[in-house]
Amino acid sequence: MAGWFELSKSSDNQFRFVLKAGNGETILTSELYTSKTSAEKGIASVRSNSPQEERYEKKTASNGKFYFNLKAANHQIIGSSQMYATAQSRETGIASVKANGTSQTVKDNT
């Protein structure tokens, strides 16, 4: 099953999206947006940037866990991954975002 985006609205009227893999696991979480239109533009940015290896910033958190940020051409963070125990599992996460990030399916939960 192919992945999809889920768009949601927070209790303080901000918007965020997540990218889900085909198994339902969240593989990328966006920043908060002040408008639904901005969040939808963020989804479009994931679609265009996710296939490009150079858009992934690989990081190590202070607790030693591994994660990545997906960045746009202007170097703004579009979304961040979960924390991974190993660098290899982070690479698997990146591969999943590459495989699912071009999805045209958006589940609007706003």
From Swiss-Prot:
Entry keywords, A to Z: Repeat
GO biological process assignments: double-strand break repair
InterPro entries: DUF1508, UPF0339_domain, YegP-like_sf
Superkingdom of source: Bacteria
Keyword Repeat among UniProt keywords: yes
Sequence repeats: 10-58, 61-109
Family: Belongs to the UPF0339 family. Duplicated subfamily.
PANTHER family tied to this protein: PTHR40606, UPF0339 PROTEIN YEGP
Protein name: UPF0339 protein YegP
Species in which this protein is naturally found: Escherichia coli (strain K12)
